[in-house]
Amino acid sequence: MKYTSYILAFQLCIVLGSLGCYCQDPYVKEAENLKKYFNAGDPDVADNGTLFLDILRNWKEESDRKIMQSQIVSFYFKLFKNFKDDQRIQKSVETIKEDINVKFFNSNKKKRDDFEKLTNYSVTDSNVQRKAVHELIQVMAELSPAAKIGKRKRSQMFRGRRASQ
C-alpha cells in the first residue's frame, strides 16, 4: 500500500510539472530571458514604483484601458526596435512581438501595420509636422463623442425610413 501512495505522489509531481511547462505562454520564458539580459530582476528596479502597472490599475473601463495599453505597446515596440540587431535577445523579442500581435491586435496584420506606421512617425520631421497640422481639425472631429453620436442617429434614422418604405 505504501508503494502505491509513493507512485501516485510521483505521478502527481510529473503531471503538475508538465502542466507548468506546457500551459505557460511562450512569452513568459522569453520575458524571463529579457529580464536576465537587462538585469531587470535586481532589487533597484522597484525604486520609484512601476512604469505601467499602476496606470493600468487606475483605469477600469475597457476603452480607457485600450488607450493606455496602446501607449504601452508603442513603448515596447520602440524598445524592441532599439535592440533588433542584438542576436542574444532576437528570439525573445520576436516571440513577444508575435504574442502582442495575437493579444492586442487580434492577429490582424493590417491593424498591427497601421499601429507601427503611427509609432514610426518622427515628430521632428517637418513634412510629418505639416501633414499632422493640416489633418488636425479632422482628427479632432473624429475624437469628439458628439460627432459619433450624430452619425449614429442619422444612420439609424435612414435605416428606419428604409424599413418603413
Swiss-Prot record:
Positions glycosylated per UniProt? 48, 120
- Signal sequence span is 1-23
Q: Which SUPFAM superfamilies match?
A: 4-helical cytokines
Does the keyword field hold Signal?
yes
Task: Give the location in the cell.
Answer: Secreted
What is an annotated GO biological process for this record, any one? adaptive immune response
- Annotated tissue distribution: Released primarily from activated T lymphocytes.
Per UniProt, which keywords does this protein have?
A: Antiviral defense, Cytokine, Glycoprotein, Growth regulation, Pyrrolidone carboxylic acid, Secreted, Signal
What Pfam families does this protein map onto?
A: IFN-gamma (PF00714)
InterPro entries attached to this UniProt entry: 4_helix_cytokine-like_core, Interferon_gamma
Q: Does the keyword Signal apply?
A: yes
PTM annotation (Pyrrolidone carboxylic acid): residues: 24
User: Which GO molecular function, any one, fits this protein according to its record?
Assistant: cytokine activity
- Where this protein primarily resides, as one coarse class? secreted
The record's GO CC annotations read: extracellular space
- Assembly state and interactors? Homodimer. Interacts with IFNGR1 (via extracellular domain); this interaction promotes IFNGR1 dimerization.
Q: What does this protein do?
A: Type II interferon produced by immune cells such as T-cells and NK cells that plays crucial roles in antimicrobial, antiviral, and antitumor responses by activating effector immune cells and enhancing antigen presentation. Primarily signals through the JAK-STAT pathway after interaction with its receptor IFNGR1 to affect gene regulation. Upon IFNG binding, IFNGR1 intracellular domain opens out to allow association of downstream signaling components JAK2, JAK1 and STAT1, leading to STAT1 activation, nuclear translocation and transcription of IFNG-regulated genes.
Family listed: Belongs to the type II (or gamma) interferon family.
| Name the UniProt record assigns to this protein | Interferon gamma
